[in-house]
Each structure stands twice: as structure tokens, then as C-alpha cells.
Amino acid sequence: MKYNDLRDFVSQLEKLGELKRITAEVDPHLEMTEICDRTLRAGGPALLFENPKGYDMPVLANLFGTPKRVALGMGQDDVAALREIGKLLAFLKEPDPPKGFKDAIEKLPLFRQVMRMSPKVLRSAPCQDVVIEKDKVDLYQIPVQHCWPGDAGPLVTWPLVITRGPNKERQNLGIYRQQVIGRNRLIMRWLSHRGGALDYQEFRKANPDKPYPVAVALGADPATILGAVTPVPDTLSEYAFAGLLRGSRTELVNAGLSDLQVPASAEIVLEGFIYPDDMAPEGPFGDHTGYYNEVDQFPVFTVERITHRRDPIYHSTYTGRPPDEPAILGVALNEVFIPILQKQFPEIVDFYLPPEGCSYRLAVVTMKKQYPGHAKRVMMGVWSFLRQFMYTKFVIVTDDDVNARNWEDVIWAITTRMDPARDTTLVENTPIDYLDFASPVSGLGSKMGMDATNKWPGETDREWGTAIAMTDEVKQRVDDIWDSLGIEIPGARPD
């Protein structure tokens, strides 16, 4: 099913039993986080807090709190179907030339579909039903969560930040958290390699004395939100990709203060500017690592206009030690990454980002090994091929007889197929998430690759072990007599 706006999605989730309305009064200061955290860890529904303490605006949380809801938001019925989205992105990232006239004709509908998904700009839109400007702008009227006891203040956690670099047609969409520091001031915490930060840096170099226009959408439709966190090729805009997910063109409307365009159905839109040299210390905040991050300087976004739908819904989340909502998103998007990696490295069988590894800091890869040193090539490929993995600290590579998603299998491979000195690759002075306080320098640290594959001649001079396995014939004979043995053990009985 496709969703034109956030309200369509909320309505469908409620019909499916995937959303719970909370009518009791709940405080956005800490209480919502505790309720959301307990619910998410139990695999529970999305939560719509209808009576946040001190506010008359409902709060939607845990929207993507299960992989199933992520898949639904992408217009799919289950997580497995996300592989097809990954295949589409892999093709768009590096399209294969047609093998002949027939192949070209078969691929033509896909190219037509992409071309038809350019956004549609409307003259008016629901997101501009109510307009608040200048001195009437007051971010404190929005029920922004204060998530953890040690947080520096309220934090906007699901902002869809819309930017454009100088002389660029393509707009960038990104999710960058924002600390509220005044009635019209937010700290824009974007890392230097992210699209929004790159747009800003280019603008500032070209226009050192001019304010930089920014728009922020809160509560867009699910396809647009998820498009902003998916590895979309640079040649395709997130708005166009959202249209592909939805099956219809993304509807936009011109912002009032700049040439940016915002999602027409968004619940709330913030418009304003980042002024030259306007910086502020951001944090500390509890983060997806399970720790409070250190304080650092980031640009300040001055909000000069707020527009919203009638009776708007504020979309929020929290981040903390996994599993949290970003970790769940990582589990689902893992399925999108696999075909993209396999397009470049066909030898990869599976790729897994364990949520307990903060969704991106550790990767397990299984592969069909073809020559000595092959595992190291795959390690380097993971680190360099997609921007999403430039901060991955640990890459474990195993053979395809190992289940990448089963730690018992992975640990067995590490402890039986690795020599620590020979099979560990250390790379120093590489980009590292600045939130990683374990690195010796902020933003710069090392990476470790672990070759847990069976070793080939040239990698070892010793006779290599053969894994123990029972014959299929014996397994079948035992299956046939199992019921007569009287052994009642869950999991031991044949299917």
C-alpha cells in the first residue's frame, strides 16, 4: 500500500494493530522516552501520544520501531521485499549497458518510470494551512522531547532538513538532529561529510557574508522520510526516489523565504537561515551509542517562519543504546544494502550490520572465496564503496558456510580460522564518527579487518582442517525414527 501523507500511514498502521493511541497525560520530558524504549524493546506498536503534558499537539513516536513498519513505509509487505529496492538502487547507481535490442526494450520501462518521478510543485499545500512569522515564531509551542536526564535540552530528532548547494538544481534531504536553544533557534548538528553540511560549506565559500537558507519538514510522508536515510545514487534526488517507493510523484510546494521546496503534506515546516559565524556548543545528548556525546560547535539555524497543517502531529523519536529506532531502521535497510554491494562484489553472499554494533560500526560479510587475499579485497571494498560504511570500525569476513546473522557461527569461524597476527588488518588514520570517543582523535581513528575465512595455499603452509558434518543419509535415517525414540526436546525434532 502507498501513502500520500503521514496521516494515511498512521491510519493504516492503526488498522493493522501496529499503532496505539495513548490518551493518558505523558510528559515529553523523559517520560515519553521511557515508554517508547520499553515498547520498542518488546517489539511493540508505534505510539501516538494524544495528551502530551503542557501541549495541545499530539506526538507520534516509534513509527519505524519494527523492521515490518519500515517495510510498510517503503510500500512493501515484508522486510525481504526490500532486497528488490536494493536491486533497483544498484541498477540506478551503475546501470548495465543493454546486451542487445531486446534487453534495451525490456529496460526502457524502468528508465521511463524514473524519468516520470520528478517532483510535482503545487501552488498551495496543506503544510501551509497555518503560517506563523517573525516575532510570533515560538519553537517552545512544539512538544519537543527531552529524552535523557543528562541531555542539554529538548532535541528535535526526526527533522527532514532540505538544503541546496550553490548553482545546484538538486536539493538534498538529510536527517540531522537539532537542539532547541531559543524560541527561534536550533543547533544544526550535521557531520562534515553529510550532504547538508557539504551544501552549506560550498555556499559559505562562495558567499561568505550571506545567510544560508534552510527548510526543515517535520512529519513528512513515510516514503520521503525513508528516502532521506537510504543510499540513493547521487544522480537521483531523494524526492524522486520517494516517488518510486510511493508509485506517484512527490508533491512539493515552494518555501516562503527561499527557493527551496518542501513536502506539501508535511505536518510542520520550519524555514529560516544559518547566518555567517553563528555557532553554538551542541550537547551533550544521549546517543545511539548508549553514551552521552561530547560537546562540539555547530551552526545555528534561525527559524523565521513556521507553517503547519491544521491540527498538526509532531513526529519524534529517541536515540539510546541499541535497540532504538535508528538501529531498527538499520536492520531493515541492511536488506537494501546487500544488492548494492553484490553489484560491485558478486562474491558477497550476505552482509550484516548487527544492531548491537550501533548499526554501522561492525559488519559481518560472508563470501565465496576465490583466491588468496580475497577476504582483504572485500574488507577494503566495504570501507570504500558506500559512504554509509566509512565509519565502520570492524569488518569480519567469513566463508559462505557461516551464517553472518548467527553469533555462534561467526565466533566459531573467528576462533578456528584466524591467526591474530596473520589475519588481522589494521588501518590507521581513517575517518571515524566524531561521536566515537574511543578514537584517539575526534573524527580520526583506526579500523580492523578480520579474515575468518578458510586459508588457501599461499596464506598458510599447514594442512587445513575439514569441518565435521554428518552424512545426509544418516540424518535422514534418524529423522525417520525420531518419533519412536521418545526424546522430547524443542528444536531436536525434524521439521
Curated annotation (Swiss-Prot):
A molecular-function term among this protein's GO annotations: 3-octaprenyl-4-hydroxybenzoate carboxy-lyase activity
Binding-site residues for Mn(2+), renumbered to this chain: N172, E238
Membrane topology, as annotated: Peripheral membrane protein
Active site: D287
Regions that span the bilayer: none
Protein residues bound to prenylated FMN: I175, Y176, R177, R189, W190, L191, R194, G195
Cofactor, free-text remark: Binds 1 prenylated FMN per subunit.
Cofactor annotation: prenylated FMN; Mn(2+)
Known pathway: Cofactor biosynthesis; ubiquinone biosynthesis
Subcellular location: Cell membrane
GO CC annotations on file: cytosol; plasma membrane
Top-level EC class as recorded in UniProt: lyase
Catalytic activity, EC: 4.1.1.98
UniProt-listed GO biological process terms: ubiquinone biosynthetic process
Record text on subunit structure and interactions: Homohexamer.
Record-stated family: Belongs to the UbiD family.
Function: Catalyzes the decarboxylation of 3-octaprenyl-4-hydroxy benzoate to 2-octaprenylphenol, an intermediate step in ubiquinone biosynthesis.
Protein name: 3-octaprenyl-4-hydroxybenzoate carboxy-lyase
Organism the protein comes from: Marinobacter nauticus (strain ATCC 700491 / DSM 11845 / VT8)
Source organism phylogeny: Bacteria, Pseudomonadati, Pseudomonadota, Gammaproteobacteria, Pseudomonadales
